[in-house]
């Protein structure tokens, strides 16, 4: 027989889902069913919480305590960059492997780096900024009209100043 369910125990479940959509509740069921939650209700709550991230793949952190689920959106660097591009949401079923050919400012990159700082492995903010610039390169957008890798080279050579914190 399984151990008795402790009401004060906190369980954390991470899920990848598309923002603003009720994902497949069948994928939720094996993860949160044993914890005494209704997958359908949690799926609707996730869709509500991720409304701002329509059409983007994001990670959702479910903190479950005493049969209550708290939903926290944990956006990836690429999701933050694509959101900063302010492109209209696309139907992801029609188009696959989209290149985002937009342009964002270096200040927005710094803001994204500050948001991601706690999850970054870099020692300083300049390292995190370089990580975000690398992600911007993979997404396919430009920064201040230039290729992101050129800006990384400028940071390394000292031509571009990074904020200290």
Curated annotation (Swiss-Prot):
PTM annotation (Phosphoserine): residues: 38, 165
Q: Which SMART domains would you find in this protein's record?
A: RL11 (SM00649)
| Placement of covalent cross-link Glycyl lysine isopeptide (Lys-Gly) (interchain with G-Cter in SUMO2) | 40
Q: Where is this cross-link: Glycyl lysine isopeptide (Lys-Gly) (interchain with G-Cter in ubiquitin)?
A: 48, 83
- Which locations, inside or outside the cell, does it occupy? Cytoplasm
Q: Which residues carry this modification: N6-acetyllysine?
A: 54
An MF annotation (GO) of this entry = RNA binding
Which top-rank group of organisms is this from?
Eukaryota
The family database entries (PROSITE patterns) matched by this protein are listed as: RIBOSOMAL_L11
Q: Which keywords appear in this protein's UniProt record, sorted alphabetically? A: Acetylation, Cytoplasm, Isopeptide bond, Phosphoprotein, Ribonucleoprotein, Ribosomal protein, RNA-binding, Ubl conjugation
- Gene Ontology BP terms: cytoplasmic translation; translation
Q: How is it modified after translation?
A: Ubiquitinated at Lys-48 and Lys-83 by RNF14 and RNF25 in response to ribosome collisions (ribosome stalling).
Q: Which GO terms describe its cellular component?
A: cytoplasm; cytosol; cytosolic large ribosomal subunit; cytosolic ribosome; extracellular exosome; focal adhesion; membrane; postsynaptic density
Q: What does this protein do?
A: Component of the large ribosomal subunit. The ribosome is a large ribonucleoprotein complex responsible for the synthesis of proteins in the cell. Binds directly to 26S ribosomal RNA.
Which family does the record claim for this protein? Answer: Belongs to the universal ribosomal protein uL11 family.
On assembly, the entry states:
Component of the large ribosomal subunit. Mature ribosomes consist of a small (40S) and a large (60S) subunit. The 40S subunit contains about 33 different proteins and 1 molecule of RNA (18S). The 60S subunit contains about 49 different proteins and 3 molecules of RNA (28S, 5.8S and 5S).
Q: What is this protein called?
A: Large ribosomal subunit protein uL11
Protein species of origin: Homo sapiens
Name of encoding gene: RPL12
């Amino acid at each position: 027989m399984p151990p008795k369910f402790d009401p004060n125990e906190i369980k954390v479940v991470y899920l990848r889902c598309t923002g603003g959509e009720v994902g497949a509740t069948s994928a939720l069921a094996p993860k949160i069913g044993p914890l005494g939650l209704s997958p359908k209700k949690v799926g609707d709550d996730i869709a509500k919480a991720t409304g701002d991230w329509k059409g983007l793949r994001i990670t959702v952190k479910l903190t479950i305590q005493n049969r209550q689920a708290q939903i926290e959106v944990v956006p990836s660097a690429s999701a933050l960059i694509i959101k900063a591009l302010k492109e209209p949401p696309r139907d992801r079923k029609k188009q696959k492997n989209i290149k985002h050919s937009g342009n964002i400012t270096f200040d927005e990159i710094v803001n994204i780096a500050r948001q991601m700082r706690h999850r970054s492995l870099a020692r300083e903010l300049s390292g995190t900024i370089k990580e975000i610039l690398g992600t911007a390169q993979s997404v396919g957008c430009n920064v201040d009209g230039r290729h992101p890798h050129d800006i990384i080279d400028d940071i390394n050579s000292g031509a571009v100043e990074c904020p200290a914190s």
